[in-house]
Amino acid sequence: MERHIRYDAASRSLILLDQRYLPTREEDFVCRNTDDIVTALQVMVVRGAPAIGVTAAWGCVLAAYETAESGMETWRPVLDGLIERIANARPTAVNLRWAVERMRAAWHSLGRADLATLITYWTNEAKRIHRDDIAINRRMGEHGAELIDDGDAVMTHCNAGALATAGYGTALGVIRGAVEAGKNITVIANETRPFLQGARLTAFELHEDGIPVTVACDNACGLLMKRGMVQKVVVGADRIAANGDAANKIGTYSVALLAREHGIPFYVAAPLSTIDRETPDGDHIPIENRTPTEVTHVGATQITPDGVPVFNFAFDVTPAHLIAGIVTEMGVLRAPYRESIAEAFRKAGL
C-alpha cells in the first residue's frame, strides 16, 4: 500500500488518501498549497510520524510554487515563513520538523540560487525522502522479523503501518517482515480510542494483505495477556528521546505496563529520524492535546453530556526501562539506550 501519498507534477499537487474515512470509504484529499498541507496534518488526513515527515517535504515543494506564483521579489522570507507554518502544524511527531529542516538545509546549500532552481532541487529532495522512507521501513522489517517467533500472536497499538509511513510500515513492517520470512503469526490490533486507528487502519491494512488480524477493545489488553493470548507487543513511535523514552499514541504506556507485568517483550519500531537527540528524556517531549469532540462524539453522534470536560491527550510516553528493544534501520537497539542510540547514529554517519 503505497498509493496514499502521491505527488502529481502536472497539477503541482499532493494527493493524500484521506484516512479519516477509512475503512468504509476511500477518498482523496488534494493539497495545492501550504494551507492545504497544514490542514491535512492537523485534522489527520495523514498521520503517523514518517508519513507526516514525507508530507511535510512535499509541502515545502508546494510552498515554493505558492511563493513563485506570488511574484514577490523578496521571496526568501515569504517561503521561510510558509515552511515554518508546516513545521509547526503538529507538536509531537519529530519527523515533521526533521523533514522541514532537511529541506531548509538543502535550500541553504544552494546559496543564492533562484527560486526555479530551488523548486527543482527540492522536488528531487522530497522524492529522496519519500523513497528512502520505504527502503528504511523494509530494513526495519528485516531486523524486527528476527524478534518474532513462528506461531506468535503480536499485539500492536494505533497504526504504525504503510498508512503511517511512505509505505510498508514500522511496527507493521516488522509484522510484514516476519510473514515474508515464512512465519505463521496472528495480530491483535487494539482499537485505539478515540480516533480508532487500530480498528480502522491497522485492521484495514492487514486484512488487505491477508495477514490474520483481530481487533480488541483497548481495555481488554490485560485479560488477553493474562490468558496467554499475546506473545509479543510491537508499536511505533512519534518521538524517541535520547535516553530511549518513546512517545506513541495515547494508551501505549498502559500496554507497556501490562506487558511488563505479564513478562511479554515490548518493542518499539521507528527510524532514526524519529529519534530526537536534542530531547534528553520523555519529560521533555511535548504532548499534543486535541479537540474534545474526538472524545465527546463518535462520528456525528454525541456520547457525553453537554458541559462535561474531557482529556484528549494524543500521546503518552513509555519509559525506556519498559522497552525490550528499539527496532531501527541500523538494527535492534538495546538498553542502555543512550549509548546504543548514539552508536547507531555514528554507524549511520549522522
Curated annotation (Swiss-Prot):
It comes from the Bacteria. Pathway: Amino-acid biosynthesis; L-methionine biosynthesis via salvage pathway; L-methionine from S-methyl-5-thio-alpha-D-ribose 1-phosphate: step 1/6. Coiled coil: none annotated. Substrate binds at residues 47-49, 90, 197, 248-249. The record marks 158 as: Transition state stabilizer. The keyword Isomerase applies. InterPro entries: IF-2B-related, IF-M1Pi, IF_2B-like_C, Initiation_fac_2B_a/b/d, M1Pi_N, NagB/RpiA_transferase-like. GO terms for molecular function: S-methyl-5-thioribose-1-phosphate isomerase activity. The active site is at residue 238. GO terms for biological process: L-methionine salvage from methylthioadenosine. Keywords: Amino-acid biosynthesis, Isomerase, Methionine biosynthesis. It catalyses: 5-(methylsulfanyl)-alpha-D-ribose 1-phosphate = 5-(methylsulfanyl)-D-ribulose 1-phosphate. Its EC number is 5.3.1.23. Catalyzes the interconversion of methylthioribose-1-phosphate (MTR-1-P) into methylthioribulose-1-phosphate (MTRu-1-P). Belongs to the eIF-2B alpha/beta/delta subunits family. MtnA subfamily. This is Methylthioribose-1-phosphate isomerase. The gene is mtnA.
